[in-house]
Amino acid sequence: MARHGCLGLGLFCCVLFAATVGPQPTPSIPGAPATTLTPVPQSEASMLSLNLGLNFKFHLRGPAAVWGSPVTETQPLSLGPGQEPGEEVASGLRTDPLWELLVGSSGNSLTEWGSTEGGSKPRASSLLPESTSRRSGPSDGPTAPYQPRRSTVTWDTALMVTALPSSAPRPHQSELELKFDMALRAGAAPTLGHRTLPLLPSLRASLAEIAGRLGPFGFFGTTLSPLRNFSGLSPPGETTSTSSASGVSGSLGFLGTTLSLPPYSLERKLSSPSPLDPAASLSFASIATTSLDPTVPISGPDDLSPPASLGNPSGQPECGPGSCSVGELPEREGQPPEAPRPLFFLTLEADWAEARARWGLAWEAHVYGVGALFGLVALLALLALALLPWRCPPGAPCLALLDLLLLSAGTTRAFPLFYDAYGHRDRLPALAWLLLQDLPLPCLAAGLGLACLLLARPRPPRCPTGLAALLLLGLGLAAAAALGSAAHRPLRPLRLASRGLHAFLAAFLSGLLLALSCWGGRRRRAGAPLGGSGFKGATPLPQGRSPFAPRESWRRAARTAPVAGTFGLLSGALQGYEVLHALGYGGQSGLEGPWPWWAFQLGLRLGEVGVALPLALLGLYPALCSPRVPPRCWAKLFRLSPGHAAPLLPGGWVTGPPDKEPLGSAIARGDAELLQLCALAGPGPDLLLQGGGCRGFEGAAANPAPSPASSPCSDYTVDFRPPSPINLRRSIEEALCSEALLAPGLFQGPAFEDALPGLGLYRTASLGTGGRASERSGEASGPAAPPELPSPGAWPAGSSVSSGSFCGLSRDSSSMLLCSSPDRPPRCPLVCVLSPPRPSGSSPSLPASGSYQALSPPSRDSPEPASELQAEEALLQEQFLDACRQIDELSVGSDTIDL
């Protein structure tokens, strides 16, 4: 009665749960049995199901059910860690009458429990758990030999191991024992290409999952291994097996990156089976739900021998010389396979051939399109560098550094994209590829900092020490990270630190650039110049200015700042996420695969191009559209210009009143030539008077009209050409013509000041500064001069005077001449002539004291005739010339002359 009661209970449970399991699709090949957890085909829609399979295991123990009963399977069932060895006989065909009563005649093929297809006979085969292997068909009929298959570990098989521990085998009894192993599983039906996590997995899988998620690298989700862990390790067709459910996640990868089998490789192996392979033609769903225990060897197609260590879970399988292929060699426990260097922080999860087949034209557009954009950045930076020496805009050193950084970033990005995009052809060594991958990041970050300086400072920006140190630190850190990660595996965190630092700098400087563009635009619209004091009107601008000092130039340059700042924030965010993903945070299940990887890499490249291209335009604008282009920029660049030490200001004048300096310093400075000399064409007189009424020159022309350019308040350098080369005579005269050598009464005095108010001497820069000339003209201001003056004499024939000039040279161009103001009333005040030295004996009446009284001009009521006046003037001229010659003779041998 006990046997019949157990049998009835079993049949009742089978009928009860037949509807719960539902109909299952038939296998693709006739005679191939199906399993319980066959996923829904790809064409059918996924639906939520609740599988309450009571995985029945019939343990038939009796006189006919012995341990050594032959079975018809060529590959034994894989046992769980705690499964009894006697449980494997449940799948074999028995000769016990009770077995025939339960399962029917031996000609019927075994189908899965609860299936309603294939006939009206009851299906009494048990539901095996997911950890067991497939069963072969009956041995009665002529069937093809069973071909063992390689199994693939998936999430369905790894997280649903429901083997329960059991004790030692019991003594054989002649009774029917029903054992219920309930595996409650709820969730969506598995579909091809997607992994499903059970809502209520088994106890062992739950503990492993909880331990993995509570770890530091799996809190936000399970991350994946680097790119080439699966695409470059094994030949096609090779799979990887794990030891347990908790062994699905390994320690491979970068900084705790877990190891999981790629679902795309499984899909590739299962979606296109060969028509000539009967084992590959089996249902791919049955293969997906099959688990392979590492303790059971995987035999080749020609090896039908049972394993030697069937009941030893810890024993290693033994393979003959030809029984195990390369891809079927067992893994050594506790020693994971060696993973290559992780070139990417977000994995591709497929090999390059499959990924490029999926991408199609998108791969070509990604590689060549982005490579062309980086090449354009490099060309713009090179053009700006070539134009900078010719245009020489303000702030040229800072612009040159910006162009150099952009040229480096553009070339290091464009070259690997065209030559070996993302290393898929393995043309570049790993170290070179890592350097080309990491070095553009500090260059772009430093470029953003230079853009902030160019747009923020009104004066010519000087590259500060902090920015230069930061640039060197970033480049050194990137190079050290690439070298360390390529040489030694434990130094890989240095590469993460470098990438994180550059991501933070890019985001920070991009935000600062956006803020500067907005704040500077508001300040410009308010009307105050950027960096100025707020006053209006004509103000003296400094000699060196910012390349964007004009309002219109700054406004045009500021248009590139929002674009560069926005793309810089995008690039920094993507790089930061890449670092977090490598650390184990943010790795969601939908981010692995070719298309997410393609989109992520495209976003990174577009963010870098969006930063580099506006910065290249920013550096090119001053070189093309600089409002002020100084001449001879090459000479100034290489210090070849004669005026590079002190450039001349417009008109030869300084902006403010000059300080009182020694007269000899005018030659040393070279920029105080306020009144240059001019050479007269042809022979000229010894004495040149312009606008004066001096007697003694007969046949003088009428008084010429005063030139407006010769007035004391006008520019004195309009009618003059550049000065002639300095000779020794002129240098000595200028060095000795100081106020300390001449008496205070010379050219001054009561008679001169009373008789000639408003008249003054205009001296060249070699004899004094413009300030002294104005002081003398101010001291001599007074009432107007008498209207009646004698007419001056005529100019000698052959002489020529520059229009409006009041100085000249003698016939031999070796002496300097001073004349009075031409716009004053026509009088001849005092004239001094410096002529070549003559013998000192020609002036016997020269006083011995060396001090002379000021010469008074002739008055209107003077009774002296014209001949006497002419003789007196000639005598005075001779006395003055003799005094000058004596000074020259005494000072020629002096050591104090500064040439």
Swiss-Prot record:
Where found? Membrane
Q: How does it sit in the membrane?
A: Multi-pass membrane protein
Superkingdom classification of source: Eukaryota
Q: Where does the protein principally reside?
A: membrane
Q: What keywords were assigned to this record?
A: Membrane, Phosphoprotein, Signal, Transmembrane, Transmembrane helix
- Region annotation Disordered: where it falls in the sequence: 110-152, 295-340, 769-797, 839-869
User: Known InterPro entries for this protein?
Assistant: PRRT_domain-containing (IPR052836)
Signal sequence bounds: 1-23
Q: What is this protein called?
A: Proline-rich transmembrane protein 4
